[in-house]
Structures are given as C-alpha cells and as structure tokens.
C-alpha cells in the first residue's frame, strides 16, 4: 500500500514531466500526485485557486492554498481503505472517482491497524481472514466533475480513479 509507505515511494519531479507521464501512460496505480504535496502553495496555481467559487462558512479562503491538496493521476489509481483525522471537502475537477464509505461505527469490523488504515481490500475482501467485514455496510458513490464530497471525521473510505483524474 502506497499510503502506508509513502516516504519510500516519494519522488520529486517537474510537474510538466509528471503530467506528460500521466497523459502518455494507461491505467495504472504506479504513480499518483496525492495529498500533502504543497503544490497549490506555488504562485503558478493562484489562478486555479481563484477559480474556486463560494466556500462554506467554516472555510477560510486565506488558508485555501495551505490547507488544500491537488490530486492528479491516471485511471486505476487506488487509495486503500483508511480514515482521515480531519474533515474534508474533495472536489472532482476532471474525470470520475469511485468512493466507498464505511461509517466509523463499523471500525471494529474494519480491522483498524497501523494508525488509520485497514488491511481489508473492499474489492476483494478476504472473509476467511476478516469475517466481521462481511457484515459491514458500504456506501458506493461515483463522483463526477464539478461535484464535491464532504467527508466527516473518522469515516472510512477507499477511493479509485475511474478516469484520468484531477481533484
């Protein structure tokens, strides 16, 4: 899982080179520009941030670049089942993503391990190893360009890019 070992996989490269790689490649989970990349703090992205319309009252526009992440990658990228330690809004700009949500009330059946992760693969759950997961209710949503997901604190989720995707 990339997320668990992200520092081992992290590479620095020019954004233009990364975009070229994504556009030239096919469906893969081998490369993905993910959260906490600080790319939106760069002046080159000011116009993109200015294009964001009205924000909910709880969001501080002055903090937008510092508290936002740009996600970009090909179809086939998967963020494995985990929960976040903060609430977030995730806006789909290009392409579609499939989100699978699980209530935090189901945490004992999700087999939480390694801080915020689950060893269960929603696509191929090993019910012999994780039998309680068979009782978990999974909400399945496809998010289209222009749509925003609100993720409450502690909700488990696994996210898959169905298309080349920017969020």
Where are the regions a protein language model picked out?
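N-terminal accessory scaffold of Fe(II)-dependent oxygenases
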Residues: 1-148, 156-167
